Amino acid sequence: MARSKATDPPADLLGPVQGEVSWFCCGTAWGPCSSTGKGACGTCNSGSLQHAWPNTSDACWSITRPDRCGVSLSRRTCGYRHRVTALCSGASVVTAIADCGPQTDLFCGERSCCGATCADNRLIDLTPAAYSQIASLSSGLRPVEISSA
């Protein structure tokens, strides 16, 4: 869901926001992922129900910049739990922040759809374990609603 230009620092997330979800690898090898770094929080693992959020710190925000896509997202730090609900199926998963990302400003206006149901802007990355709870990893991107758990 597009919001007006964000202020700096961004306004608090007043309710659910819609956007795209993708998936990423972190930590120990799992499924399609080889071993890699543990993410900005130092706890990220591909086999855990975790996610990356674009506003975990000032340093993170300076890289991801969802405000450049017209989206204002609240500051949430490591361990904060979000519920991610697939707009296509209604399936949802609760995950904890374990990394900074995605770099939203690289994907402004990007859109994913299932039929006539669409969402814009890549706002959250799930680990493969979490993403596979709401969609097939082969789908790559899906429209979702993100809310506090």
Question: Model regions: which residues?
Answer:
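Secreted/periplasmic proteins
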Residues: A2-A149
